[in-house]
C-alpha cells in the first residue's frame, strides 16, 4: 500500500496512459509481442487500480474537472497565440475561468490523501 494525494494519482494515471499509447503506437496494428503483452496487462491493471482509487475516494469528478480545465487552457492559449482571439476580451475571461477551475481541481486533488495498492 502506498499513500498518495489525488494529484499524484492523476500524474501516475497520465504516465501509465502515455506508456500504453507508446506501446500501441509502436505496433501499428500488429500483434503485441509476448513481453509487451505482459507489460500492457500490468499497465492496464495499474490504470484500473488508480481509476478505482479516484472513484472510491470521491476524486474522479475532480480528476475530470482537472483534465477538462487543462484542455480548455490549451485550446484558448492556441487561439490567443495564433491571433484568433486578438482583441476579444471574452477569450481572456474564458482563460481566467479555466485557470481558476484548474487551480481549484488541483488544490482539491492535492488535499486528499489516498491509500493505493500499486
Residue spans for each PLM region:
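Small side chains
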Residues: 6, 47, 51-53, 77, ...
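Short, charged, amphipathic alpha-helical segments
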Residues: 33-45, 63-67, 88-97
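Amphipathic alpha-helical binding modules
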Residues: 70-118
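Non-transmembrane amphipathic alpha-helical segments
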Residues: 16-23, 50, 69, 76
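Short terminal alpha-helical segments
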Residues: 1-44
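Short, solvent-exposed, charged loop/turn and helix-capping segments
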Residues: 46-65
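Charged, low-complexity interaction regions
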Residues: 24-37, 59-60, 79-91
